Amino acid sequence: MALIPKSPTINLCRPNAHAIPLVFQSDTPDPRDVVFLQDTTGSQGPYIQSARKAIRDICDKISGSGRLSKDLIRFGLIAFRDHPPQDKTYVTKEFGFTSDVDVMQKNLASLVASGGGDGPEAQTAALAAALNMDWAENAVKMVILITDSPPHGIGEASDGFTESPDRKSLDGRRFAT
């Protein structure tokens, strides 16, 4: 993660990272809404602490960059696990938007990796929940998905879900991946 000097760009990936670089442009004073979708199933056990740290670092970099005032940036968090009967705790857990990085850090600290039960998880439910969040009307919107598994109902013929329960709410929406 790096701020590019004398540039309106905040790069959210480490150099040489095994990821697609995410670039947060700040050319205009439009508000920014950034939502993190965090897999909290048991398979995330070895990774959840570093995922929480990476999210905190991203929020700190964006908030501390001085390129956007506090009232122009909001962060959201949705934790997701799996659909019953594989997991009975929750499918999604929504924390809503906040401009306060300390609140975001408290929300992140509450995440515990547990449950799941099969390979695919409830990413489509998390995406559907993200679509229904209280987005600022004129905000530039970004969703960052953090997971190690494929979603139920999309491309997994033997996962027991012929179609994701939330896929219909995603149909017709435009996503950049």
Residue map of PLM features:
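Divalent cation-coordinating acidic motifs and surrounding scaffolds
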Residues: 1-177
